[in-house]
Amino acid sequence: MKFAHIADVHLGYEQYNQPWRAEDFAKAFKVIAEKAVESNADFVVIAGDLFHRSLPSPRTIKEAVETLWMFRKENIPVFAVEGNHDKTSRDISAYHLLESLGLLNVLGLRRNPVRGENVESLRIQNVYLVKGVVDDVEILGDRHRSKWQLEKVLPLLKPQSDKSVLVLHQAVKEVVDIDLDMAYELTINDLPEASYYAFGHIHLPKIYEFDGKAIAYPGSVERYDLREASKIVRYRDELVLKDGIRKGFILVKNFRPEFVEIETRELYDVEIEDESVEGLEKKFLEVLGRADKEGIMVAKLKSSDAVDVRRLSEVAAKRVRYAEIRFERILEEIEEVEIKQESEFFTEFELKLLELLRGEMDEDEVYSLVVEHYLSGGALKQEEGAEERVVEEETEKKVEEQFKGDEEADEAERRAEETEKAKSTKKARKPKTLLDFLGVEEE
């Protein structure tokens, strides 16, 4: 038993608003069909998103008919489910049009039974489960569903044969968790029994093994977005080139998957960085020189100075089929500033004065603090010599700033008079107020 597993064809997708990109997707589908026919496949499954939209254009439908006819001519039955892009809330979709032409069979729950050479309908309450049959192999499946809908639908997709294929367009948690950042609708434990799980929806080719069986995603047939680039280019200090994602389909032999690669248009994911504009442009031109002229390039350029993106885009348009260039400025790194504690700069007395400046002490407390400090020798006891005088002068300066004293000359004169008074009376006079103690006249 041999069959082709295809998914995410996205016929009609004019990527980057370029009509010729829709032609690329149609061409990829045709190449896959040719390879499937050459491999003598017994049947084909399409696991969703045959079309990019639920209402494809006449041109897109024509492209689908022409390729599916290749299978019809060889009597190779095709079984398909609708994906999230091309499903419709109506009873009839583009899939049913193709079904009426005898080009494919739509799997899943239906209001009415469908019967044919390779199709059976099983009544379940008031609906019918339409499934495919090729020799002794059952092909079951259903359209893209929400998580809560799957809870009701999956138990109905149980095979009656020992050999079966389950076709779904959903994301399985265990596969998504490998290296993809996307939501999922089900887990492996939710899946009904099957010999092979033919999935669509994830655009990167993935084959996940469990219990000797495969959950497989062939990926999209063409490069749907930048995550599916064929070449990854990084150029900072040196040029680094890496191969990207392969495109194709899966050929399944006796329920064992084998990926078959096809050639598609090159898509370059480019990031270039240089401090100078001149260096950046030189690197960009070097990368352009290596690119295929029929390829697509999406480039992010980083520099400290602004780059003329428009001019570079014009240059790139002459070297490749299509280019998108984005600029990102390199921001200077901000140095971390160490924040020191106030205690590292001020004495204990000065810290207490700071509390005054913040309005956290009343006048009586300040008065007691200053008197106690100066009567005990204050800052003069801390160190000797010139350093003592510096500390004292800085302390006096802070106090002067707090209370907005008069000019230094007047202040010195008043202190001299007070000193003479003290000598004549030989008795210390207790200051009446803090302002009086500091020699500042009250206004």
From Swiss-Prot:
Keyword Glycosyltransferase: no
Superkingdom classification of source: Archaea
Active site, per annotation: 85
EC identifiers of the protein: 3.1.-.-
Biased composition range(s): Basic and acidic residues: 395-423
Residues given in the record as Mn(2+) 1 binding sites: 8, 10, 49, 203
Span list, region Disordered: 382-429
Keywords: DNA damage, DNA repair, Endonuclease, Exonuclease, Hydrolase, Manganese, Metal-binding, Nuclease
Coiled coil feature spans: none
Cofactor mode of binding and number, as noted: Binds 2 manganese ions per subunit.
Regulation: Nuclease activity is regulated by Rad50.
Disulfide bond entries: none
Pfam family, one: Metallophos
UniProt: Mn(2+) 2 binding residues: 49, 84, 169, 201
SUPFAM superfamilies with a match to the protein in the record: Metallo-dependent phosphatases
Cofactor(s) required for function per UniProt: Mn(2+)
GO biological process: double-strand break repair
GO molecular function annotation: 3'-5' exonuclease activity; DNA end binding; endonuclease activity; manganese ion binding; Y-form DNA binding
Assigned protein family: Belongs to the MRE11/RAD32 family.
Quaternary data: Homodimer. Forms a heterotetramer composed of two Mre11 subunits and two Rad50 subunits.
Function statement: Part of the Rad50/Mre11 complex, which is involved in the early steps of DNA double-strand break (DSB) repair. The complex may facilitate opening of the processed DNA ends to aid in the recruitment of HerA and NurA. Mre11 binds to DSB ends and has both double-stranded 3'-5' exonuclease activity and single-stranded endonuclease activity.
Stated name of the protein: DNA double-strand break repair protein Mre11
Gene: mre11
